[in-house]
A protein has these predicted regions:
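Conserved structured catalytic cores and adjacent interaction surfaces
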Residues: 185, 197-200, 204-205, 211-271, ...
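Phosphate/diphosphate-binding loops
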Residues: 1-30, 34, 42-56, 110, ...
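Extended, highly charged accessory segments
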Residues: 25-30, 36-192, 198-206, 211, ...
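Glycine-rich tight-turn/loop motif centered on a GG-T
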Residues: 192-200, 229-237, 297-309
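Alpha-helical context
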Residues: 90, 94, 98, 189-190, ...
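Flexible, glycine/charged-enriched surface loops at secondary-structure junctions
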Residues: 128-133, 216-223, 325-332
């Protein structure tokens, strides 16, 4: 009879007790009290999901041009059928059997993307378990643009608007809307190099270009490898992102800019995870979407429209990224 209420705390919830006043404060009461003085700050958080919605998806390349680009980025028919297709058809990653007798990337005599040289090597058991399904209230892929300063420095934090998206994965239409939205505050950096240039010199070039752009007030860097041709080759995007991210950190400039990637290499969730892990803010896998369009035109997705295929693919990537986040991950 002396128990007034009972229950248990959910993920991210708290309670408070004022013993001298004999009061118990619930999770919502505490958070409402703390949030009162931050109303102005909340008005500066601008959600871009409606402005950058998935609609009227278009492809960039098709036919022989697309096949050449797929070959250039090391995307095989097996990748399209066993990895890409199930992600759009089932809205989740394909399930495969255990066992992989292929050589390690460093020992292989076949082309392996740079992503294959990185492994998710460690998973820490926690109690209670960190699970992206049961802990969905405190796990999010919400992505923040601009104003990347110290979140504890409130005076500085409230000087500029903060733009957020629910996912770091952008479709082709979203990416175009993104570029138009930020306009002059974004600059594109070409991540390809010609036959007479070295990869080392090209990396130095994009590092210098990024520094100049940030010092000129640009808030959105766009790293793109779309300019490949008979005379220009793509640089490994993972290397480009990591090089620019580290360079800007050393120059004390990283907090002023977001790094957005337009890559033909990214296809599976591991490639997205590694790109984000080395510093990418958003990723637009344009060749993956063009490959989906190619398969959609062949009526391989049944009743689904192309827009729906794109949405289902992004949904599968998001779900897997949350699973990767739910464990302690070290990349070697």
């Amino acid at each position: 009879k002396r128990i007034l209420s009972k229950g248990r705390l959910g993920p991210g919830e708290i309670i408070g007790v004022r013993i001298e006043k004999g009061k118990v404060f619930t999770n919502n009461q505490i958070k409402d009290y703390l949030a009162k003085e931050y109303k102005h700050f909340n008005s500066q958080i601008i959600d871009l999901d409606e402005k950058l919605s998935i609609s009227n998806e278009k492809h960039n390349f098709d036919g022989e041009d697309l096949r050449r680009r797929q070959h250039t980025f090391g995307i095989s028919l097996e990748d399209l059928e066993l990895i890409l297709h199930p992600m759009a058809e089932d809205a989740k990653e394909a399930t495969g059997s255990m066992g992989d007798d292929t050589p390690l990337a460093v020992l292989s005599d076949k082309y392996r993307p740079l992503y294959h040289f990185f492994r998710q090597n460690f998973s820490q058991v926690t109690n209670p378990p960190i699970d992206s399904l049961r802990e969905n209230k405190v796990m999010s892929l919400k992505t923040r643009f601009g104003n990347l300063g110290n979140i504890l420095d409130f005076d500085t934090l409230t000087k500029e608007n903060i733009y957020v998206l629910n996912s770091p994965i952008l479709s082709n239409s979203q990416f175009n809307k993104f570029i138009n939205f930020f306009g002059k505050n974004s600059v594109s950096i070409d991540c390809t190099f010609s036959n007479d240039q070295s990869l080392f010199d090209s990396i130095k070039r994009i590092q210098k270009d990024s520094e100049i752009a940030v010092r000129q007030g640009v808030t959105q860097l766009v790293l793109s490898d779309k300019a490949i041709s008979d005379t220009r080759m793509p640089m490994p995007m993972l290397l480009c992102v990591g090089a620019i991210n580290t360079f800007l950190i050393d120059k004390k400039l990283r907090g002023y800019v977001s790094i957005n990637v337009q890559s033909g290499e990214a296809l599976d969730t591991h490639s997205f995870a590694t790109l984000i892990g080395v510093g990418a803010t958003t990723v637009n896998p344009y060749i993956a979407f063009d490959s989906l369009y190619q398969r959609h035109e062949k009526k391989l997705f049944g009743q689904y429209s192309f827009d729906e295929c794109v949405e289902r693919y992004i949904k599968s990537v998001n779900a897997r990224l949350l699973k990767i986040m739910s464990k302690w991950v070290y990349l070697f």
